[in-house]
Amino acid sequence: MNEDEAIQNITKKIEREKALINAANAMRSQTNNEAVRSPLDSQMRDGRRNLQFFEEKLRDIQLRKVGQGVEGMSLGADDAGRPPPPPKDASSAAWGDQAAYGQQSQVGPPSDLAPPRHNFGAPGPGAASKARPNFTKLDLIKYDTPYLGPRIQHMLSQIQFKLNVEEQYLKGVEKMVQLYGMEGDRKSKADAAARRVESKQKILLLKQALKRYEELHVDMDSADAQDDDSINTPNLRKPLSGQLSIRVVAIKDVDHATTGRFARGPETFVAVKVEDTVMARTKVSRNDRWEAEYHNMEVDKANEIELTIYDKPGEHPMPIAMLWVRISDIVEEMRRKRIEAEMNSSGWVSADRMGSTGAPSQFPMSPTSGSFGGSPQAPGGGQGQAPGPFGDPAPQPQVVTGPIDGWFNLEPAGQIQLEFSFVKENRDKRQVDLGLGRKGAVRQRKEEVHEMFGHKFVQHQFYNIMPCALCGDFLKYSAGMQCEDCKYTCHNKCYPSVVTKCISKSNAETDPDEEKINHRIPHRFQPFSNVTANWCCHCGYILPFGKKNCRKCSECGLTSHAQCVHLVPDFCGMSMAVANQILEGIRVQKQRQQKTTSLSEKTLRSGATKSPTTAGHGSSASFSSAGAGSVPGTPSAEATEAARLMYNQTSPQRPGQPGRAPSDLSAAAAASAAMAAAQGRTGYDSGPQDPYGQGHYGAAGPAPQHHKYNPADYANVDQGFPAQPPAQQRPPQPQQQQQAPPAQMPPQQPPPQQPLPPQPGQQYQQQQPAAQKPQPQPPATAQGAAAGPPGSQRKALPSATDPGTGARIGLDHFNFLAVLGKGNFGKVMLAETKRSKRLFAIKVLKKEFIIENDEVESIKSEKRVFLIANRERHPFLTNLHACFQTETRVYFVMEYISGGDLMLHIQRGQFGTKRAQFYAAEVCLALKYFHENGVIYRDLKLDNIMLTLDGHIKIADYGLCKEDMWYGSTTSTFCGTPEFMAPEILLDKKYGRAVDWWAFGVLIYQMLLQQSPFRGEDEDEIYDAILADEPLYPIHMPRDSVSILQKLLTREPDQRLGSGPTDAQEVMSQPFFRNINWDDIYHKRVQPPFLPQIKSATDTSNFDSEFTSVTPVLTPVQSVLSQAMQEEFRGFSYTADLD
C-alpha cells in the first residue's frame, strides 16, 4: 500500500471513529440509566484513543511523504564533494551533541530501561533514528497502555494463534462426541457436548476480537516491526517454576450474557488456567467485584496463564471474555520495578540523562590532567581514588517490591483488575547487592550431531510454538531437531525422513536426486504485510510484523523470512512430505541401478585394460583446463586423504581466500603429501625467510625479540582511521611469492611445485640459526594496508601437536606446593621443579572429564592459543612453558604470577580512575594482539586478569578462546561468564570479535564503579538485564568515562566501538585514553599505580584462601581409559625451556 492509499484508508477510519463517538454521545444524552451509560462511556473513551492513534499515523505518513520528496534534493554545490560520514565517532569532538548521531525520539516518557538502537551509527541522509520504545509485553495488555500500535500488532498475532488452536480443539471434541454417541456413553457424551458449546463460544469471542483489531490495524510500510529478539532467546522463553499469587479484584465493561427481563444479573466467576489446567476458580459474583479473592498456586515449568470470565445464565457456564499472561512477562515486570526502585533510591542515572557539565576538579581524569605515572601504593590502596559520588560505590538498599497491580484488557471487550506476583524457584539465588564476586564461565554442551543429506541436525528444546518443516504439525514447547547450518526445523520423529539436501551447501544445485525430480517449480516469493500469526516454512520461527522481513509465495501461499527464502526447495504446490517421499523413491531406484550397472561392467570389462598413456594424457588435459599448473597426473585417493589428514583441513574456508577448483586443491594436497613423505616428516619445511622459523617460546638460540612498537603507527588515531599496526604486516617474502596473487601468498615457503594457502594445522620448523631471524617490516600506510585483501595479512596458526624444543618432562619433575584455584575443569596448582626450584602454575585436567564433555578439541585449541601468546612473548599474556600428560590427566605448565587476580584486589579496595585506566590500556593491547592473530577471547573478566609483582597485568585462562576469527568471521557457540556475555550471544545469533569489546566495556565499568552494570538474582535475570536495561552512572562521573562505556556497551554489534576493520584502534583513539602513550604501555615504561606485596616467593596470600587451604594432592582416578581414548591426546606434550 502506497502513501496515498494509506492516507485515504486512515481518513476513512478517522471518519468512522468520529461517527461512532457522536452516536454514543447522542445515545448517552437520551438516558439517565447508569447501566446504559457505563458501556457508552467506555466506548467513547476507546473511540477517542483510537482517534488519536489514527491521527498520529496520518501525520507520520504525511511527514514521510514530504521527507521522500526532499531526500533526493541537493542542498548546495558544496555537498557534492563531501565524503560520507565516518561509521564511528572517531573525532569525539562533541560527546554531548546528540545531533551528531541523529535525532532521538522517545515514545512515552524518558526511561532508563531500554536504550535506543544504533546509538553511534552514522545516520543516513534525511533519516532520523528513533529510540526503541520502552515497554514490555505486559505493558501491551494493560488497559491504559500508551503503545496502541504495538498492542494491535501483538494481539493480532496472539489472537490468530489462539483461534487456530481452538479450532483444532473443536474438531477433536466433535470427534469425541461422535465416538461417545456410537458407544452409548451418555455421561461422557454430555460432557463432551458441553465442552463443544464452550469451544464454539470461545471461537466466536476470538473472531470478534480479531475483527476489532483488524479494523484498527494500519497497513503501511512504516508499521514494520523489528524482529522480536526474544523469539530466539531460550533464556527468556523457557518455562518457569515457582509460586504464583493472583488476586482478582473486579471486572468492568464486559458483555455479559443476556438473561430474562425480570431475572437478576448472571452469576459471574473467573477461572485461572495454567497450561490448560484449571488451577483456581473465584466465587460467583453478581456485581462484578470480589473481596479477598487470593489464590496461591505452585506451578512447575509453566509458560502461560489464561484467565477466562464465565457467566452462568443457565445450566452451563458460558465464557464471555479472556486474558492471557506469560509468566516470563510477570517476572520481567517485577524485575524492572525493583531496578526502578533501586535507581530512584541511589541517585544514579543513565548516560542520556546525565548533565552536560564538565567533570569536577577532584577527579584525576579530567581532560587537562597530566600523563600517567605515580609512586607505588600500599596494598589495597590505589593512586587516584576518587571520593565522593563518583568514587564511592552506589548505595544498594534492599528494595522490596510489591505485586503487580493494574487494569488489564479482556478480549473481546472489558477490563479486569488484577494483582499478581511470581516467586521463582531459584536454587542458586543470590543477593543482587553483594557487589562483585567470582562467577564461573558457562559453555554450551556439545550436542550429538545427526548427519542427514548434508543437514547437521542437533536436538533443541523450543520454548515457543513452531511448525515442523516436513509434516507441518506444531512443536508445542517441546524438543525438536534443527540443522546447525540452514536452521531447518522438524520433529524428532521426522528428521530421518528428510531427504532434501541441505541447501546451504555449495553443491546443492547439482544434486542428482533433485535434478531428476520432475516437480521443480520455484516459489514466487513476494513481500507481504504480515498482520497475523504466520510462521516461516523453513526455520519454523514466527514472522515479524510488516513487509520488511516477510515473504509469501503468490502461488502456494507458503510464508518465509526474507533471509530463509533461498533455503526453501523449489517444490511449489507440493508439500514437503510428498516431495521427500518422491526423492526417497528416486534415491532407492538409483541405488538399484548402480548395483545393476556395476555387475554388468564387471562382466563386460573382465578382459579389458586401459592404456596408461591415454590415462596420463587425459589427466594432464584435465589439469590444464583447471589451471592447476605443471603437477602431472591426477592424485590418488590415498594421497589426497593423507594430505587432508596431515593438514587437518576441517575448518571452513576463510573469506579472504578465494575458492579453488576441486582438482586444483586435490593436486596440491597430493603433491604436498608426496614431498612430506619423501622428506620423512609430517609437515613441509620452512624456508630461510620463514617469519616464524625461530620456533616457539624457549627455543634454542637467542630469544625472539619484540616487534618494534612504532609510535608513528598511532599518530593518526585522532583522525579516526589510523595506520595499520606493524603486528598485522607481513615480513619480507621471497621474490616469487611477492609476485603471486595476494590471496595465495603463504606465510612460509612452500614446495616449488604448487603454492598453498596457509593451513591451520601446519607446523613450524622448531630451530633455526639466529642469523636468519627476519626483521620487522616498516609500517605501511593505512591506504596501503587496505589495498590487499584481509587474508593476505593473516598469520598461520600453530600446530596442536608441536612438541616444542626442550627435553621431555613428566610429573616426577615437580613438587606441588599449594592449590591456587579450582573449577569444573580441574585445578590450578603451584609447583616447583625439583632440580632448579623454579615456580610454575600447573593447570591439571582429567582426561575422563575432557572425553565425557567432548572437549578434546578445546584442549588442543587452548594449547595453540598458548603458542600464539608464546610467539612474540607478549607482555600482557600468560606464557606456556610445557605440556605433558599421564594416563589419567593432562597438564599445562604456565608461568606463575604471584600477585593474584584483579577480582581479589578490587574486593580489597576500589581502584580509582587512574589505576582502572592503566589496567584497561594493557588489557586493550592484549585483546588487540589476540584479534590480530585471529583469536577471540570470550571470557574477559577480573578473575582472569592476573597482576604481576611489577604491577602489570597478564591475561590467563584461554579455555574459551576461538581461533580463525578474523574481521567478518562469525561463530555461534553459547559461552562466557553471564555478566560479561554480549547480547548477540544471548540471542543465539552469529557473533564475531565485537563480543570481546562488549566484555571490555563491562570490565571498565566494574573497575571504575566496583559493581556490575547488569545484575540479577540469577543467570536469567542477568540475561534479561543485558538485553533490556541501560547501565547507570553517578551523576558527576567524567564525561570521557561515560562516553567510552556507552559506546562499548552498545547492543548492536555492528555499531559497537571496536567492531570495525580497525578493531582496537577505535578503542585506543577514545578520549578516555587520550593521556596514554601506547608505546610506553607496551614496553612497560609506565610506572604502575600499584604493586602487590608478598612475603616470600611461595607466598599465596594473594589467592583465595578457600583454595590455598586445600592440601595440594591429586585425587586418585578409578576409571581406565581405552587405547582409542588415549589416542585422542597424541601429540599433546610440549616443552619450551624447562630445565
Swiss-Prot record:
The keyword Kinase applies. Residues 1074-1139 form the AGC-kinase C-terminal domain. ATP binds at residues 820-828, 843. It holds the Pfam family HR1. The active site is at residue 939. This is Protein kinase C-like. Keywords: ATP-binding, Coiled coil, Kinase, Metal-binding, Nucleotide-binding, Phosphoprotein, Repeat, Serine/threonine-protein kinase, Transferase, Zinc, Zinc-finger. Residues 358-368, 594-614 have a biased composition (Polar residues). Stimulated about twofold by phospholipids or phorbol esters. The gene is pkc1. The keyword Magnesium does not apply. Gene3D superfamilies: 3.30.60.20, HR1 repeat (1.10.287.160), Phosphorylase Kinase, domain 1 (3.30.200.20), Transferase(Phosphotransferase) domain 1 (1.10.510.10). It comes from Hypocrea jecorina (Trichoderma reesei). Residues 615-629, 761-793 have a biased composition (Low complexity). Residues 723-734, 743-760 have a biased composition (Pro residues). Residues 814-1073 form the Protein kinase domain. PROSITE patterns: AGC_KINASE_CTER, C2, PROTEIN_KINASE_ATP, PROTEIN_KINASE_DOM, PROTEIN_KINASE_ST, REM_1, ZF_DAG_PE_1, ZF_DAG_PE_2.
